[in-house]
From Swiss-Prot:
This is DNA-directed RNA polymerase III subunit RPC3. It is found in: Nucleus. One of its GO terms (molecular function) is single-stranded DNA binding. Pfam families: HTH_9, POLR3C_WHD, RNA_pol_Rpc82, RPC3_helical. InterPro entries: POLR3C_WHD, RNA_pol_III_RPC82-rel_HTH, RNA_pol_III_Rpc82_C, RPC3, WH-like_DNA-bd_sf. Keywords: DNA-directed RNA polymerase, Nucleus, Transcription, Zinc. Component of the RNA polymerase III (Pol III) complex consisting of 17 subunits. Its main location: nucleus.
Length: 606
């Protein structure tokens, strides 16, 4: 076979580059070629795929089976021509992209055995419960595995696999829509637009029912000897949507930590984890269907309607008592809320306080984040050791009492960024859609401030507030020299963070009479950053693979059974040095890759 991954895989788009590199790293050269071809040409038959990729048909078919198993490829059989078409599915490769973080999180949360189960499922794509347990002979081990599988499934980390999971969502929608439209009769009293919209609404209902079918308790579980377990015939796979919700929880927690403080962010993290499983998906099925929702206003209204429905159903609503039950034992919130109402010094009989003497030396009380922003007027003759704070409104006897947690929730709901919304007294919900805008904005601003400097950061913030401005206006507003402003504008333009608009003052558009305005558009700026991060991730993976290929002979030698464990005795000093450098280089690159991936996740789905 002479086929190689085409150069277009790297140049076509940043996503194409990343997905092809991931496929090559985890699944091999042939899988990368097939993925690249399907991204370039769209859906193809096996024969067309073989012709365009120059891979033998037999090898194409065997590779397609593995890729379908791993959810990297979807297939669709046309009813009229009976041909089977294959199309690219990013879900499988995204699981490979996050596999390390997925396994690490499951290990920390559920233990090593649960992490092993998730790792096995990721490796094979999906599996039947009875097939997974049939090779285990010890009944006690089988019982433990069944309990772990039930726990992971109940918490949403595993999901049921159905036929619709292997079919392209566009083809599935189109088939249902055409059937519904055909069964919706034309009428002289109903316009064609109304008829089409009516058919769309009916199709949405059918499509939702199709995706949610097969999830009844009778089909998923069975009770044997009074013990509940998953049905042996159930086919399960890892649920990527559940992990994306977990990453969103981490992003929101980090934002709260940066804006409010560590202890409040811990309380917020508990609140987010409480409703995480039932929170709205980051990738809703309707938004993946081409041409269904094109208007940004309509898309925003649709996303908000989903969130509002979850609030109405009480799925993303919690109260203070719920948090008290799940608060970690090592979380100590005592004396974390310091205000005028909570710091009233009581009368101390050992030393009288003269109320007639004016206060000349006010004491400062440090808050959790170290800011001296609260001033309490205390008598200078009263030492700090003799103060007895009467906490009338907060209970400091317990590390996380109801009143303490409630005050932290008040902090989260009353700030500039609405981390929480108080529906009724003591009952809260999380405005996910609005908060993700703040997450992107704050991380973007921080990135500019740390990489380009304070002047660029000030300039961009000024431009955001002014919407549209020229150099002179910007210089006067942020109090910088025009030369400095010009230099910073040049840096921002090179990174596509701002746009330039030419404004001619004469009909002939003479350059001497032309001036320029600047603006910042979030969508284009975020899009450029996202593509840059995506390309960098692919480039790092390619570099790791490249220096492994450059030292292929040495690495193959180390993999030999007689060499493993005896490297220091059997390898030359130069080979040991090269091996150590390779290891350090790979560790550094993987660390860089994970840091970039953290930003990539924030700006994904912007």
């Amino acid at each position: 076979m002479n086929a190689v991954v085409p150069d277009s895989a790297k140049t076509q788009s940043a996503k194409s580059n990343l997905y092809t590199t991931l496929a090559k790293t985890h699944l091999g050269e042939v899988a990368a070629i097939i993925v690249s071809t399907l991204i370039s040409y769209g859906r193809l038959t096996a024969k067309d795929l073989s012709n365009k990729s120059e891979v033998p048909l037999k090898l194409v078919k065997s590779t397609l089976v593995s890729l379908i198993q791993l959810s990297c490829i979807s297939y669709w059989k046309e009813e009229s021509s009976k041909q089977v078409f294959y199309s690219f599915n990013e879900n499988g490769l995204l699981i490979f992209l996050h596999s390390g973080d997925i396994i690490n999180h499951i290990k920390l949360t559920y233990g090593d055995e649960s992490a092993g189960i998730i790792q096995n499922i990721i490796e094979v794509g999906h599996m039947k419960i009875e097939d997974y347990l049939q090779n285990i002979e010890d009944p006690e081990v089988v019982f433990n595995k069944e309990n772990l599988l039930l726990k992971l499934f109940s918490d949403g980390w595993l999901s049921r696999v159905q036929m619709s999971n292997f079919q392209p969502i566009d083809d599935l929608w189109n088939q249902l829509y055409q059937e519904t439209l055909k069964n919706t009769p034309r009428s002289t009293t109903i316009s064609e637009i109304k008829r089409v919209n009516e058919a769309k609404d009916k199709t949405k209902l059918k499509f939702t029912n199709l995706l949610e079918s097969g999830n009844s308790a009778k089909e998923l579980f069975q009770i044997e000897n009074g013990i509940k377990k998953l049905a042996p015939s159930l086919v399960i796979a890892f649920n990527l949507s559940r992990f994306e919700k977990h990453r969103r929880t981490e992003q929101l927690t980090n934002l709260a930590k940066a804006r409010i403080g560590i202890l409040t962010s811990k309380v917020y993290e508990c609140a987010l984890q409480l409703i995480e499983q039932h929170s709205p998906d980051l990738r809703h099925s309707f938004l993946k269907i081409s041409g269904l929702i094109n208007d940004p206003v309509e898309e925003q209204a649709f996303v908000n309607s989903i969130e509002n429905q979850l609030v109405d159903d009480k799925k993303i609503v919690f109260n203070v008592k719920d948090l008290v039950k799940i608060a970690p034992k090592d979380l100590d919130l005592r004396n974390s809320i310091l205000t005028h109402n909570f710091l009233k010094p009581t009368f101390n009989p050992k030393k009288r306080v003269n109320d007639d003497i004016p206060d000349t030396n006010p004491k400062k009380i440090k808050t959790e984040d170290g800011m001296n922003n609260l001033m309490i007027d205390l008598d200078p003759d009263v030492s700090e050791n003799n103060l007895d704070f009467d906490m009338h409104n907060t209970d400091n006897s317990e590390p996380h009492s109801v009143s303490l947690i409630n005050h932290h929730l008040k902090l989260l709901s009353s700030g500039v960024i609405p981390f929480l919304i108080e529906i009724t007294p003591g009952t809260y919900t999380v405005p996910y859609t609005d908060l993700m805008k703040y997450v992107k904005q704050c991380n973007y601003d921080t990135l500019i401030k740390t990489t380009l400097g304070l002047d660029s950061f000030r300039l961009l913030r000024c431009l955001k507030s002014l919407k549209l401005a020229d150099e002179k206006t910007l210089a006067n507003t942020i109090l910088l020299k025009e030369k400095t402003v010009r230099n910073e504008l040049f840096k921002l333009m090179n990174l596509n963070m701002i746009e330039i608009q030419e404004v001619p003052r004469s009909a002939d558009r003479a350059a001497s009479k032309t001036f320029y305005l600047f603006r910042h558009k979030e969508f284009s700026a975020y899009n450029f950053l996202y593509n840059s991060l995506t390309f960098c991730m692919a480039d790092i993976l390619s570099n790791i693979q490249q220096f492994k290929n450059d030292n292929k002979i040495l690495l193959e030698k180390c993999e030999r059974e007689d060499v493993k464990g005896n490297e220091e005795e059997l390898l030359l000093e130069s080979e040991l040095k090269t091996l150590k450098n390779l290891q350090l280089r790979e560790i550094n690159n993987i660390g860089k890759f994970n840091r970039i991936k953290t930003l990539y996740e924030i700006f994904d789905n912007f």
